[in-house]
Amino acid sequence: MALAVTSSSTAISGSSFSRSGASSESKALQICSIRLSDRTHLSQRRYSMKPLNAESHSRSESWVTRASTLIAPEVEEKGGEVEDFEQLAKKLEDASPLEIMDKALERFGDQIAIAFSGAEDVALIEYARLTGKPFRVFSLDTGRLNPETYRLFDAVEKQYGIRIEYMFPDAVEVQALVRNKGLFSFYEDGHQECCRVRKVRPLRRALKGLKAWITGQRKDQSPGTRSEIPIVQVDPVFEGLDGGVGSLVKWNPLANVEGADVWNFLRTMDVPVNALHAQGYVSIGCEPCTRPVLPGQHEREGRWWWEDAKAKECGLHKGNIKEEDGAADSKPAAVQEIFESNNVVALSKGGVENLLKLENRKEAWLVVLYAPWCPFCQAMEASYIELAEKLAGKGVKVAKFRADGEQKEFAKQELQLGSFPTILLFPKRAPRAIKYPSEHRDVDSLMSFVNLLR
């Protein structure tokens, strides 16, 4: 795997960020840079304005040296005013993505870049083009992307006349990970370690050469982790060119845009898209950790499907997760209840224990173990309620058991809980519950499961 990463990097020339348009040199003097100084609040930055005279990198430079870091021109520090990015985010709350992109590029010039993942965030590049301003694009090549994603990279470069800056993982770190744990260790002990080596550390190197970056995050992508992302913020996790906490600004122009609207924009503007989208993929990452979503599933359920909803961030946007594992269980109490229907029985822990004890039941029971804050539970709510209506009076009780918080350990030990949602069928004459094995949570699939085993 280390050899694959190394060989792929040699195939791509240049590591300084690409610029859009042949007029970038003439515009360089008009672009201003921003220098960070001491601050008292993370939402504020002190900056000074100075004309930027950037010299392009010589093509004779070693690509290894240039790929290891993104070098931004140095500027002198001068006294300046304080900018409050929390207030700016509020001002831009009703702004269009185009307005937000224009503001970001105007403010940071060539010290800001678009993070491109090879999915629908190609919309960011189109918005940048529409501003008429120079822009830069970078992407993380983990060495394990789908072929369709690499083809999209090529199509985007040709469409916009740019060179995407590809950042690669450290070959030594990848080699150590694979030799010690194998190629697919993330299926057994979680994806965080692999993502840290292949994505987070390369991103950290990239951002150290910038003062701001632009992402394609949307609030509707993951209610569990992204529901509160602002239009613009001081990055809570990564450092920028000037170093230290608060030295990097993060822009999210699509934060308030729904996925359907993004796709309407892409179709209208005839923008190249990843061929995987036509195969049912929505959220696209590395090949082993990405799959198509199914009816009744949330788009992020196509990523790291073997893990809980709260774990479905790779670390690039870790600041979205405001609570750690233990704290997450204390949050759901304030979340609106789901699976509310006269045909769905709400079970207590005692009720579940009784089901476990019975070997001969008068009726079969179908029980969903859920957490109301889980976006994947929310996504199957309509299907489950419809199923309950169809099974009413037909010898199968449909129920729910809230298995987060204090009940989580009990559910893990006694009810086969691995992730939310978990669906169990307690047959009429069987001592053990049968766990629904599929990710298909549409009405027909669930009904077939019940009818075959009831």
UniProtKB/Swiss-Prot annotation:
Q: Where is this region: Disordered?
A: 1-21
Main location class: plastid
- List the residue ranges of the region (Reductase domain): 67-319
Per the UniProt entry, the disulfide pairs are 374-377
Q: Could you give one GO CC term from the UniProt record?
A: chloroplast
Q: What is its EC number?
A: 1.8.4.9
- What are the Thioredoxin domain coordinates in residue numbering? 333-454
Which tissues and organs express this gene's product?
Leaves and stem.
Transit peptide extent on chain: 1-66
Q: Which domain of life is it from?
A: Eukaryota
Q: Which UniProt keywords apply?
A: Acetylation, Amino-acid biosynthesis, Chloroplast, Cysteine biosynthesis, Disulfide bond, Oxidoreductase, Plastid, Redox-active center, Stress response, Transit peptide
**Sites of N-acetylalanine modification:** 67
The UniProt GO MF terms for this protein read: adenylyl-sulfate reductase (glutathione) activity; adenylyl-sulfate reductase activity; phosphoadenylyl-sulfate reductase (thioredoxin) activity
What activates or inhibits this protein? Stimulated by sodium sulfate > ammonium sulfate.
Q: Where are the transmembrane segments?
A: none
Cofactor(s) recorded in Swiss-Prot or TrEMBL: [4Fe-4S] cluster
User: Per its UniProt record, what SUPFAM superfamilies does this chain match?
Assistant: Adenine nucleotide alpha hydrolases-like, Thioredoxin-like
Family, according to the entry, reads as follows: Belongs to the APS reductase family.
HAMAP family reported for this sequence: CysH
This chain belongs to which protein, by name? Answer: 5'-adenylylsulfate reductase 2, chloroplastic
Q: Which organism is it from?
A: Arabidopsis thaliana
